[in-house]
Curated annotation (Swiss-Prot):
It is a multi-pass membrane protein. A nucleoside 3',5'-cyclic phosphate binds at residues 383-503. One of its GO terms (molecular function) is voltage-gated potassium channel activity. The chain crosses the membrane at residues 64-84, 94-114, 138-158, 165-185, 200-220, 286-306. ANK repeats lie at residues 523-556, 560-589, 593-622, 624-653, 657-686. Residues 85-93, 159-164, 221-255, 276-285 are extracellular. Residues 256-275 dip into the membrane without crossing it. This is Potassium channel KOR2. It comes from Oryza sativa subsp. japonica (Rice). Belongs to the potassium channel family. Plant (TC 1.A.1.4) subfamily. The lineage of its organism: Eukaryota, Viridiplantae, Streptophyta, Embryophyta, Tracheophyta. GO terms for cellular component: monoatomic ion channel complex. The keyword Oxidoreductase does not apply.
Amino acid sequence: MAEEYELNEIDDTLHGSVGSRLSLFARELKSRRSSSWHGGTALRLPKDLYESLVIHPNGRWYRIWANMMFLWSIYSTFFTPFEFSFFRGLPDQLLDLECVQLVFLADVAVHFFLAYRDPHTYRMVHDKRHIALRYIKGSFALDVLGCFPWDAIYKVTGRVEAVRWLVWVRLYRGRKVMAFFKRVEKDIRVSYLLTRIVKLITVELYCTHTAACGFYYLATTLPPAREGGTWIGSLSLGDARYINFREVDLLTRYVTSLYLAIVTMATVGYGDIHAVNTREMAFTVVYISFSIVLSAYLIGNMTALIVKGSRTERFRDRMTDLIRYMNRNRLGSAIRSQVKDHLMLQYESSYTRDRVIVDDIPVAVRSKMSQTLYLDMVSRVGLFRGCSDDFLSQIVLKLHEEFFLPGEVILEQGTVVDQIYIVAHGCLEEVANGEDGSEEIISELRPYGIVGDVAVICNIPQPYTVRVCELCSLLRIDKQSLTSILQIYFKDNSQILSNLLKGKETESKRKQLESDITYLLAKQESELVLGVNNAAYHGDIFRLKSLISAGADPSKSDYDGRTALHIAALRGYENIVRFLIQRGANVNSIDRFGNSPLLQAVKSGHDRITSLLVEHGAILNLEDAGGYLCRVVRGGRIDLLKKLLRFGISPNCRNYDQRTPLHIAAAEGLHLVASTLIESGADIQAKDRWGNTPLDEGRRCSSKPLVRILEQARTVATN
């Protein structure tokens, strides 16, 4: 595609002399003898096309032919108005010039075999039927009409004036001249300033040349008796008079007409040559009006050359810098070709410039634009199916559109990937590369497909190489942007992991991903629980609400079995406890240490939270009530003991030695604790594994008040 401006090697002195530029052209011509048909990119044609007679547009011989046709197009474009105005039928000595039309007829035949690049897919089309249909629907009719011998037809039809006008169809060949200048403007080997100046001079000369022919045509189409009333018939310059101007030599007549056209375009005043009759005046009015527009065009282009602000010049500067960089680092031809093709695609599509413009728009407005452009497409991507609208809105805001040419590799197998691509237009293919260098096409990706998702989400190397089949428009989102969004929308994170597993049709793919996704789900769940518990620990109810609204489960426990309700009850945050209960948190969950939320509230002395939990069905739920109550008694925590007894713990529960809390209180001499236990119904006659009663323990302790309390309790129990 970009062979016109590509160089295999280029000196850094690009702004040198004309001689150095010619030497560059010579070296380039030699280096292209065998580079047109071979190569692995999708922009090149198969090697067997010689047999099918399809011509490559970048082939050496066709380029020579195209340059030759460019020269003949210049001749035809300039000679056509000259022939129309100065000859009413070509004289015999110029009839041989009509043979040139055979060259253009041959060019018509060549176009039936000339491969072309599809503007939508960027693939080279080499099917002769498609080539012929495209050419017939395009410029075929005008090209063929231009090849007709209109001079001979004019003479055969009795010199009908309308037939002469048909010769103007040959001006359609001027498109070859415009295409040449457009191509040279992008050729970094040629001075951009010189190219633009030559182009502008050519435009100016052609306009004045055509106007000169028009002025002369107006004079020759009047009857001979009225030719004295024309601009040239009435002309008198010094001793020369043009009364019989047809007898004046051809060169003098043309130069005189050209002088009139240039003076009129320059609008230097009403000179010695001027319009005489009404037709000439009307033509002059139209011509001067056109010259004003042309002058503005010329001045505008010269101004753009001075300020160096044109898009083409920026492209040339960037291409020059890239080629210097690639030459300095001796990059391979495949990489060079891919870089140049991609830069050319950017230039033709101008999408990078548009993206810069969008970046300057406020985020709120850009968000609405992104939703309008991409939301429908993203919602139809399998990976994001079932995700919330808020999540999708954040995704589309981070998307960037990129274009890729056929043959380009988007992702390589085994590499670390940090972006995900959504196919907006075009076609990709996933290819598995074997150890022996073989390739196996795994799948073909069309619009709404996605690549890089497995590698990015599962944090694994890219499993397959992803290659462009036809010109693609891809929507890219960076891994960092996606990760930051997923950290906020936890529920959508789980949905994406589920979609990722469902989206892999084959059993082998599913088995490969199951372990990774299971690990990610467990990791995500543990991180989410830690986030919820951390918010509960610090009393941050707003953060807690956002986490639960995003999909966090308030009943999930951390590595110690603690839930957010455990922590809130321990820390005394009544508003958080109330919120968690409203969100369905389990009020009777037990951590690995045997603590329930109610027990945590009781131990911490948060009476209001205790009442709130009991009101919603919470119980102490002690697995080893006897052992725990005995430890409370041994610690002398009488207030906690009273609360535990009030919430249903039996005073006669036993520890592993069958000792009751009253045994412990008697052994430790805690008469106040013993009184509390007796008042709560403790059995004074209970025996431990050694047959000892609380009274026996009290007597060994030698605490007279305690013994007296125990004996009174025994007497009461006996009676």
